[in-house]
């Protein structure tokens, strides 16, 4: 019975996470295919490169909310363990959506969204770290990497070892998805916030 619940939670999370809101919103707005501009990513940062700040904000919000919703729904029928599996599923769904031949986003908004659903103070810490790094360095990718690196440590320090383990895995995946950004940061060629590629 529990195995069935856990599988359902993982699949629920994956299906929620795989909804490509950035692509959907930009198509509705009549902009060019998001995958053909900037980084080719379907997330909010690349939507911002279209010059449509409202669309970028909506993408960020909806990508976060799909993670939060998956966690809350899974928690309602399967408890904390199911919620964590839904979080993992949502993150994987965003990174590797079946609808887009498994080529999705980099996961920052969904990371925040599932963190809101599982332990909202952690999401506040993540956002504050992101903001502080963004203000000082003006690199969206670096801001996300710094915040994601510290988040599992914060969760462990405040007595949530299971969540710390989950977010350590999510952080590793997030770093992998940002591997090209890391190379550009090292080379000094990464685009700053507000710049078009």
Curated annotation (Swiss-Prot):
The chain crosses the membrane at residues 5-25, 54-74, 80-100, 112-132, 153-173. It is an enzyme of class 2 (transferase). One of its GO terms (cellular component) is plasma membrane. It comes from the Bacteria. Catalyzes the transfer of an acyl group from acyl-phosphate (acyl-PO(4)) to glycerol-3-phosphate (G3P) to form lysophosphatidic acid (LPA). This enzyme utilizes acyl-phosphate as fatty acyl donor, but not acyl-CoA or acyl-ACP. Probably interacts with PlsX. This is Glycerol-3-phosphate acyltransferase. It comes from Rhodopseudomonas palustris (strain HaA2). The lineage of its organism: Bacteria, Pseudomonadati, Pseudomonadota, Alphaproteobacteria, Hyphomicrobiales. The gene is plsY.
């Amino acid at each position: 019975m529990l195995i069935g619940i856990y599988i359902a939670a993982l699949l629920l999370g994956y299906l929620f996470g795989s909804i490509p809101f950035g692509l959907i919103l930009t198509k509705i707005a009549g902009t060019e295919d998001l995958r053909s501009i900037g980084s080719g990513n379907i997330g909010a940062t690349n939507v911002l490169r279209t010059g449509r700040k409202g669309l970028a904000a909506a993408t960020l919000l909806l990508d976060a909310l799909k993670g939060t919703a998956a966690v809350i729904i899974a928690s309602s029928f399967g408890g904390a363990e199911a919620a964590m599996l839904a979080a993992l599923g949502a993150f994987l769904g965003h990174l590797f959506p079946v609808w887009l031949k498994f080529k999705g986003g980099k996961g920052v908004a969904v990371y925040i969204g599932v963190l809101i659903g599982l332990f909202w103070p952690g999401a506040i810490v993540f956002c504050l770290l992101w903001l502080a790094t963004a203000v000082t360095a003006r690199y969206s990718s670096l801001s996300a990497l710094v915040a994601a690196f510290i988040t599992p440590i914060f969760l462990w320090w405040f007595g949530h070892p299971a969540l710390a383990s989950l977010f350590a895995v999510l952080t590793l995946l997030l770093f992998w998805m940002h591997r090209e950004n890391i190379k550009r940061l090292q080379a000094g060629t990464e685009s700053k916030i507000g710049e078009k590629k």
